[in-house]
């Protein structure tokens, strides 16, 4: 499992011109899965993200987690996090989980967040 995390003051996702999701202050999380991912790994990553102190406190220090600020999450499945361009000029996604498995892992990660 790979996660790419971005702090935001607001964010939204549009698909084919229709708003599918939006948040105010919080985190946008792009997550990708591989066939070797386990329940334990997902649980560990989810807990780590929830506890990361990446938001400023009143003194400007990064001392607060998304939980501390009661921030929101926008979670986007992103198989391209497992792209490889080691050979040739076309990305390979062999390391990415198959779509059905990835969807199940994505749903499992949502339950733990």
Regions found by a protein language model. Name each.
Residues 86-101:
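A charged helix-plus-loop insertion that forms the helical arch/lid used to bind
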Residues 1-54:
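N-terminal structural module
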Residues 111-113:
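Conserved small/polar residues in nucleotide/adenosyl-binding loops
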Residues 101-108:
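Structural signature of FAD isoalloxazine-binding scaffolds in flavoprotein oxidoreductases
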Residues 41-42, 46-89:
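Ordered, amphipathic secondary-structure segments that act as subunit-interaction surfaces
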């Amino acid at each position: 499992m790979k996660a790419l995390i971005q702090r935001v003051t607001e964010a939204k996702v549009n698909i084919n011109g229709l708003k599918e999701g939006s948040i105010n202050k919080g985190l946008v999380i792009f997550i990708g899965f591989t066939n070797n991912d386990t329940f334990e790994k997902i649980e560990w990553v989810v807990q780590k993200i929830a506890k990361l102190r990446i938001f400023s406190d009143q003194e400007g220090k990064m001392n607060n987690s998304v939980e501390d600020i009661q921030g929101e999450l926008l979670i986007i499945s992103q198989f391209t996090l497992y792209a490889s361009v080691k050979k040739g000029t076309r990305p390979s996604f062999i390391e990415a989980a198959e779509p059905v498995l990835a969807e199940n892992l994505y749903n499992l990660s949502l339950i733990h967040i």
